[in-house]
Amino acid sequence: SFTSYQQAREVIDTTGGEYYAEMLANKGITYLGSFHNGFRQLTNSKHAVTTPEDLKGLKIRVPGSAVYMGVFKALGASPTAMSWSEVFTAIQQGTIDGQENGCSVTKSAKMDEIQDYMTIWNYSYENDLFVANTKVWENLEDNTKELLQQCATESCEWGRDRLEAEEDELIKGFQEEGMQVDILTEDQLQAFKEAVAGVTAELKQSYGEEACAAFGIN
């Protein structure tokens, strides 16, 4: 994953965006831009997580995705696929120890009220795409396409800026509420990257070298 929103912007606005455009064009879709959905962070009720060893044995709710399951298994945790609607109660009852999600979702779901520890590690970046049906797009006047492309670009930038500012405020709020928030350093993150190297290798095989190279996955 990217290490920062700045890196995400730089990659997606160059090689990543080019890859999206080519891939979508083959499906009759025109790519107009990309905006953040956010980095996924970790919260739990047990203890601070700053090393892979800290995750060992922790029961963490993840979406039902082989990638997420693989990452947490590689880190020694016990990933649990569970409906999001069940997570709050499961944490209260001790069925699971924590969850991973974006800061805004963590706040809206009131996880900060039942979780004492948060790890900012940017382990997974998610974004949404601004697209158009190519058949419809090609029937538009050139000046209309230019205007819509400009609006799409401006909207994506606005969305990115807003999410980044909102997350900074949310993290400050979590800390002020008494939540321990550990923002991992590059050295700390390196240990996690090494622990999931096998999963990264599998992703390269699954998605192909071209896709991985486009998004800076080496």
Residue ranges of predicted features:
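N-terminal secretory/targeting leader peptides
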Residues: 1-7, 16, 24-218
